[in-house]
Amino acid sequence: MSNLDPMRPRVSVVIPAFNVEGYLGAAIDSVLAQTLADVEVVVVDDGSTDATVAVARGYGDARVRVFENVRNQGPARSRNVAIDQARGEWIAILDADDWWKEDRLERLLALAEAHGADIVCDDLLLVPEGAPGPESTLFTVHAQRLGRIDKPFEVDALKMAEDDFGILKPLFRREFLDERGLRYNPAFRAGEDFELLLRCLLASARMVVSHEAMYFYRARRGSLVASPVQCLSQILEMTDALIRDVDAKTHGEIVQALEGYRRRKRDELGDARFREPLHAGRWGECVSLAVKNPAMLLRYAAVLGERFLPLGLLLVLVT
């Protein structure tokens, strides 16, 4: 039962915000419209140069609390500031350009109580940039890898490392985070979600994921980092740090899974390094990268061949 105590809300919703004047209102509105009324919103502005702060302060609602970083410090540090200021029993993560279904908190807290969970998440409704609504869900897009998901399931550290659920937006039991001194690692501007979730699981957190999709995830270019190359480079640094820190003797399977995760991200980085000049029309750079990497050449030969060289000549360059 909700106590509606403003000094001890059931849920504190953490929103780091940077230059999101056109999106932040929808995020906050979706929290204030929740069927669970016992909430507060903690917005931390990360050095915005637009009207983001004005949007947040414009609510004039005691449930919406606004803090400002003196300079841009990244989403991890901003979330930590918000968590430290939060007063709720649960900490919910919401990105400033996303929003929720109105009963998301009520459903996820019921799931947490039913399973005795320390962390609960749900599927994501994927909204492409510029689209009016979702076109798919995360679990649907990855159905070949994840299989059919039609009921809640638990995620342990090994499953997190193998299947990469780091993109999910969790609710954390505040007591669990505080007792174990766990926060986001501010050294990373990408991959920090995966890193914290894995460290929580290594600290014996119980994580349950709903098969329902109640979080609208907007795929917006430039929302966190400058480019996919920069993002993936940060994720690789984060993964290297985890592999160094995790005890291979105690958690050998997890280290092996992290090494596999690192290999996949390295492949993605190679592709991203090719796609950036491809999308920018820097064709000479594309050809140079393709010549150095025959596998990449075969994947993108049709594009390069139409624009630049016959496929046969491209193949000659690498044989």
Regions inferred by a protein language model and the residue ranges of each:
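C-terminal subregions of glycosyltransferases and related glycan-biosynthesis enzymes
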Residues: D5, L202, M207-V209, A213-T319
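Nucleotide-sugar donor-binding/catalytic module of glycosyltransferases
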Residues: M1-S233, G312-L315
